[in-house]
Amino acid sequence: MDFKQLEKQYRDELLQNVIPFWLEKSQDKEYGGYFTCLDRQGNVFDTDKFIWLQAREVWLFSMLYNRVEKRQEWLDTAIQGAEFLKKYGHDGHLNWYFSLDQQGNPLVEPYNIFSYTFATMAFGQLSIATANQEYADIAKKTFDIILSKQENPKGKWSKAHPGTRSLKNFALPMILCNLALEIEPLLEPSFIEKAMEACIHEVMEVFLRPELGGIVVENVNTDGSLSDTFEGRHLNPGHAIEAMWFIMDLGKRLNRPELIEKAVQTTLTMLNYGWDKQYGGIYYFMDRKGCPPQQLEWDQKLWWVHIETLISLIKGYQLTGNKECLEWFEKVHNYTWQHFKDPKHREWWGYLNRQGEVLLDLKGGKWKGCFHVPRGLYQVWKTIEKLNVQE
């Protein structure tokens, strides 16, 4: 692969195609915040605002401002979204709602812990860009609330009957791996080291299962044992692979090459397991025993799964020189650019059927916003840049 050309391809796609799309199409100039329900051309088809996606867009533009270029336009975009979130996104005690209407009235109660994690990321990154102490405080206080909710993330909003089947889920420790590095500048060093070790332990010792051939499961019993239930058999290959680049970043930060190596091997294991050998692409959901999955969309091909996989593969190659990572990167790169990039209009499709045909031609919705595509393009660009410097 021509790394010089690839570096340019990812950088240009980010800065000339994807970012201008969100800058132009997503900002609500009337009420603040962002529209994320955007059709193929970028027209708004629903005005509700989802806290995950509002916060992710604040984070993304803050991150670009901090790491790529001090463009005022990017900072202004992040600040206006953050001010909307600060005013309307929570109940006054930093319990973050799931969704709001266009004006900022709450629609869905604060049942979802990931509203909190993305708010922490957003205000943490923006506080670095602005040196604004209020933003830093919001990030730190929200992070404290997340830690207090770790054992029971949904709290009073949980539908599960207490005590019958207590499962713990992979998503929170996985996100905390990323969050620990994201807001490290705001926290005490001794606390951060402990938090990092705890996350690594959960991801690599609890959810990664050597007895299943080294795959990562989404749910285990609270005592760490496997559960032979829909939830306990549930696999999400993209989630597991995304977590592995967080672990690689932690391995680099903590100078632990053996951890990086394990994350690389797990990436390859999950990719071999999750790749659709008939049509190409990575399955959305699987069942570890090969039973019929609960989710009807199990065989769809989703944008974020493939983009996160590209990040893990190129980081794995850059950090270890593993040739299998590079071979897979080429294969996943070709599939992703061929199937998800819209050849006529800006931004990428999110949802394909199993055969790789466009299922929904939207560019944003309730779950797809200004996050996985631009973050992925940025991460791959910067990793390939390192490879080019190494050469």
Feature-to-residue mapping (PLM):
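Glycan-recognition and catalytic cores of secretory/periplasmic carbohydrate-active enzymes
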Residues: 1-391
